[in-house]
Amino acid sequence: MRIGIYNNETAESQRVTKVLKTEMKRAGLTYVEKNPEVVITIGGDGTLLSAFHHYQKDLNNIRFVGIHTGHLGFYTDWRSFEIDDLVDSLVKDSGQAVSYPLLDMKATYSDGQIENYIALNESTIRNVTRTMVCDVFINNHLFENFRGDGLCISTPTGSTAYNKSVGGAIVDPNSVGFQLAEMASLNNRVFRTLGSPIIFGADAELILRLRDENGHVLTCDRDQWMLKSEKERYLTELSYKVSKQRIYFAQYRHNNFWNRVKDSFIGGVH
C-alpha cells in the first residue's frame, strides 16, 4: 500500500511528520510522494481541505486519514500521540472506508465561459460593495429574489463549518444532499426572502442568477476570488448539485459525529 503525507508548516506538524515517517519505515510501510493510495494529513481540518483539493483529480483512488496537531477537527480522527496505534492500523489495513458527498459548482460568465469546481465544505457568493441581488431557482423553477450580503451552499460534512456561523443547520454527514443558508438577508415590506436554511435532496439543482456585474466574491472551501467586470466579462450564474464524486476516509475506528459536535460546540453537559 502506497502512503502519502500532507502536512502544514507548524513546528508540531513537522515533528509529527518526522516521527510518522520513522515509524512507517520501521513497520515496513511504503511512503510515496506520487500516486498514493492513502493520504495522511497532519494539521487540522484546513490541512485536510488543502490535501483534498491537491488530490481532487484522483479522489476515487485515495482514502484520507487525518492527524490533528492543534484543536479538535471534524475530519481528523487521530491525535499526535497516537502514531503507534495509527501505524498498527495501517499495517492491518484491509481497504475499509467511509465516504461522504461533495458539492459540484458550475460558474457561468457573460462571455459563455464555464468553470467547474468541487467543494468538500462549502461555496459562498457575496457582494462586498453593495447588497447582493440574485434570482434563486430550485430545479429550474424560480423560488425567490434574494437580497442580502450573500449565500452559503454547504455539504453535510461542511454544515458544522461556515454554514453554522451564518445560522445554517447541522446535517448528519450520512445524508446525501446540500444546504442553502442566507447571509444577512434583507427583509422588509418591499423585499422578502424565506429567511431560513433549505436542505436539498440528492437530485436537486440550485441555480443563482446574479443581477449585478461587479463586487462579487466567490469562494470554494479555502479558495477565494474577487470577481470584477473586465471587457464585458462578468459572473452571471452559479449552479450547485451533489457531485458524482465522493471523498473516502480510511475507517480504522469509529468516531461518533454527534460526540464531536457536542465536544466542539457544547462541552460538558451538566
UniProtKB/Swiss-Prot annotation:
Catalytic residues as annotated in Swiss-Prot or TrEMBL: D45
GO cellular component: cytoplasm
Source organism per UniProt: Limosilactobacillus reuteri (strain DSM 20016) (Lactobacillus reuteri)
Highest rank taxon of the organism: Bacteria
Main location per the UniProt record: cytoplasm
Name recorded for this polypeptide: NAD kinase
Co-factor(s): a divalent metal cation
Keyword Oxidoreductase tagged: no
Higher taxonomy: Bacteria, Bacillati, Bacillota, Bacilli, Lactobacillales
Family: Belongs to the NAD kinase family.
Keywords linked to the UniProt accession: ATP-binding, Cytoplasm, Kinase, NAD, NADP, Nucleotide-binding, Transferase
GO biological process: NAD metabolic process; NADP biosynthetic process
GO MF annotation list: ATP binding; metal ion binding; NAD binding; NAD+ kinase activity
Keyword check for Zinc-finger: no
InterPro entries recorded: ATP-NAD_kinase_N, ATP-NAD_kinase_PpnK-typ_C, NAD/diacylglycerol_kinase_sf, NADK
Binding locations of NAD(+): D45, G46, N121, E122, R147, D149, T160, A161, Y162, N163, K164, S165, A184
Catalytic activity: NAD(+) + ATP = ADP + NADP(+) + H(+)
Record function comment: Involved in the regulation of the intracellular balance of NAD and NADP, and is a key enzyme in the biosynthesis of NADP. Catalyzes specifically the phosphorylation on 2'-hydroxyl of the adenosine moiety of NAD to yield NADP.
Pfam families according to UniProt: NAD_kinase (PF01513), NAD_kinase_C (PF20143)
EC id: 2.7.1.23
Compartments, as annotated in UniProt: Cytoplasm
